[in-house]
Amino acid sequence: MTNAQPTELISLPSELLCHLFTYLPQRQLITEIPLVCRRFNTILNDDKFWSRRIRTEQKVRLPDCELKHPEYEPKKSFYAMHRQRDRWRAWETQTVITAPGHSATVDSVMLFENNNKQFCLSGSRDRTIRLWSIENARNGEDTEQNPWTVAKDDTAHSGWIWNMAQESTSTNFYTTSWDSTVKSWHITDNGALQNLNSVNVGSAAQCISCSGNENEVVCTTFAKRVAVIDSRTFQVVADHKLHKRAVIALAVQGDKIFTSGEDRLMMMVDRRNFSKPVLFEYSPTAYKSCLSLQCNQLLTSTSDGKVKLYDANNFNVLQTYSVGSYTRQSFLEHGAHLIMARSLKRNYTFSIYSPGTRSQQWCASHELAAEPAKFDYSPSSRTLAIGNGDSSILFCLPASAPDQEN
């Protein structure tokens, strides 16, 4: 090429530009580079560019049910995988904080943000709810000037607290307990925990979700019941007992209510017709200990140490992989499968697997010192919280802040 033919980046062949783009910071590639010129914008908004990177760089094959979901975008999917791999490069690269405070097993943790601040709610077998400030835990020791627990209710329930769920549009949240009640709560402007309502569902209440229809909360019980509660009147307005034993896992999306029980049945029931299941599966060897629903996919953990991914539209099995002797919890996150499992040596680890139908392990923790009960993960803050059997909570914080991601 002579001096009479100046080289300009914009004049390079598209194939070469696509290759060069893979070396740029991913956030910049999505938010800034498309604004440089029309040609860059065209290349970086082409679904084929991102789909190819998902297959070749991430080595992920996504199921058809996700690809056909109306909210699926290859660019967002690739970036979600990139963020997860960056977050979990190695377990040792993060900051792990052990937070004492409860006096019994912490069966429920729930991360959320309010006014650009990070918080965690925890519920325990000591019948107490605590509200934790993640910023204060990150900033230093738990002192009177820097309290980690910013609010608590020592008499929240008269039995063990099993689960929590929060409304997406407010600071209202819900709790279930061994005392057979479901309670609604509000975090006031000054940070206090205010009990709003309570309803008795007849037996120990287990799972809870408010991700279905507006103004409805769905819960399950140990006495085979799945109940729908009107959040305005806080009364049970519909229920079914299609399971034969305790209902221990729940996932809800719109009118679709997915449950699994100790009877080894997994089913989907339409909210508009509780008389019979639309879909069901019976497993002769193991029950599903957890359900996680996203983009037409249902990720399940099993009592015999497996993780199974289903097409939520028809219960077709998309993949199965083994993670130990017992899978405590599975979490289907944009860009990854998050798994808590017990090994054959009866030690627990937290693992991250690639999404899609050919999952590979990306990262794993060391053997956890305390037996975990439940975890939650916040994709916006990239924070992991683990409630433990020794009454502590682990807050696992990323090495870099979200605004420092590449």
Curated annotation (Swiss-Prot):
Q: Could you say what a knockout of this gene produces? A: Temperature-sensitive phenotype with defective touch receptor neuron synaptic transmission conferring variable degrees of touch insensitivity amongst individual animals. Touch receptor neurons and GABAergic motor neurons have mis-localized presynaptic vesicles as indicated by aberrant expression of the protein snb-1 and distorted cell bodies. Reduced rate of inhibitory postsynaptic currents at the neuromuscular junctions of GABAergic motor neurons. No effects on cholinergic synaptic transmission or snb-1 distribution in cholinergic motor neurons.
Q: Which UniProt keywords apply?
A: Repeat, WD repeat
For this protein's source organism, the top of the classification is:
Eukaryota, Metazoa, Ecdysozoa, Nematoda, Chromadorea
Compartments where found:
Perikaryon
Q: Which residues form the signal peptide?
A: none
The species this protein was found in: Caenorhabditis elegans
F-box domain segment(s): 6-53
Tissues with expression: Expressed in several neurons in the head, tail and ventral cord, but absent in touch receptor neurons in adults. Expressed in GABAergic and cholinergic motor neurons.
Role: Plays a role in mechanosensory transduction (touch sensitivity), touch receptor neuron development and synapse formation. Regulates expression of the protein snb-1 and the distribution of synaptic vesicles at synapses to promote synaptic transmission at the neuromuscular junctions of GABAergic motor neurons.
Cellular component, GO, one term: presynapse
The protein's matches in PROSITE patterns, at most eight in alphabetical order, are given as: FBOX (PS50181), WD_REPEATS_2 (PS50082), WD_REPEATS_REGION (PS50294)
User: Can you say what this protein is called?
Assistant: F-box/WD repeat-containing protein mec-15
> Which superkingdom is the protein from?
Eukaryota
- Subunit: May interact with the SCF ubiquitin ligase complex component skr-1.
Q: PANTHER family, from UniProt? A: F-BOX_WD REPEAT-CONTAINING PROTEIN MEC-15 (PTHR19855:SF33), WD40 REPEAT PROTEIN 12, 37 (PTHR19855)
Query: Which Pfam families is this protein grouped with?
Result: F-box-like, WD40
The record's section on InterPro entries has:
F-box-like_dom_sf, F-box_dom, WD40/YVTN_repeat-like_dom_sf, WD40_repeat_dom_sf, WD40_rpt
The record's WD repeats, renumbered to this chain, cover 101-142, 156-195, 242-279, 281-320, 365-406
Q: Which gene encodes it?
A: mec-15
A biological process (GO) of this protein is:
positive regulation of synaptic transmission, GABAergic
- Write down the SMART domains for this protein, in alphabetical order: FBOX (SM00256), WD40 (SM00320)
The UniProt entry lists the main location of this chain as other
